[in-house]
Amino acid sequence: MKLKRLLLVASAALAALVFSAPAMALEKFKIGYLRVMDDAQAMAAYEAGLYKKYGLDVELIEFKSGTDLIKAIVGGQLDSGVFGFTNAVAWASKGADLKVVSGAQLGYHAIVAREDAHINKVADLKGKNLASQAEGSTADVVLKGVVFRDAGLKPDDVNVLGVSPQVAVQSLVGKRVDAAFLFEPQARIAQLIAPVKQIYEIGEVWPFPCMVVITSGETLKNRRAAVWKSLDAQRDAIELLKKKPADAAKLIAGYFIAEPTLKTLKHGEMLREDVIRDAIKSQTFSAKLNDKEQNRMQEIADILQAQGSLKTRDGKPFEVKSIVDLSWQKDRKL
């Protein structure tokens, strides 16, 4: 009887210890992102608790541009980031050890113009003011190396202002610029709140992997399991965005529109979740980087070199495959 009582006491003590102890410690992991729809999977994974599902305690850190974000990865302040790969190419050409480990989103960039600016096609931008991303960003490279080129424009034919997407929208509303080259949802928001129209969308004519997931070679070597867990979480978030855009919109709408509703010019007050849902539907998210997309990445790197913005140590063409590590993608059989 005494033995039975002792066993009961011991069992109760053990149970108390188990339930009072904190849950298994999550591994800390820092991810940089931009507040644009291209990075929706990073935000959705955080808000849906997917990082925790895979054992990570993630700190999401916002940056205004990929050119700033890459510095934090090179400097060791971040474990990974979702942003344009041209930033990694530029730093890798100087010797930085960086790795593209996953896809994220295929480029959606729209040119929207004020209706009173008399801009109906890209060629009409000559002599106009255009808000875009920071110089050297993937958006900037594609704008000048593809969009302008195909329209017969030279980079200096247009006064390009490098600002954040949020400032670009404000500049359109305030008539400080004639047009803007925007991500979603800023392109959609601009058309809802200001007298502007879309005249071009690069994804329709020249699709490319705009956003990818990048980490440092050191982080991938020393924390490969954690990097892969973060990619698993973002892959799940991409499935949520693709299959349940309305549910995903409820999670991330607050990142883009502060108030519950958006006051529009023609549709009255719109729920922010409805605006973001439609923006999500316009996107092509993919964690996989296929051969076609890798070839397009090489094409963009070649444009960088042709512009003189990318110089390798030996003067040879930069090989994008030298910074691509798709071991996670292969292991997950994507």
What role is predicted for each listed range?
Residues 64, 170-180, 190-199, 208, ...:
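A residue-level marker of the well-folded mature domains of exported/periplasmic proteins
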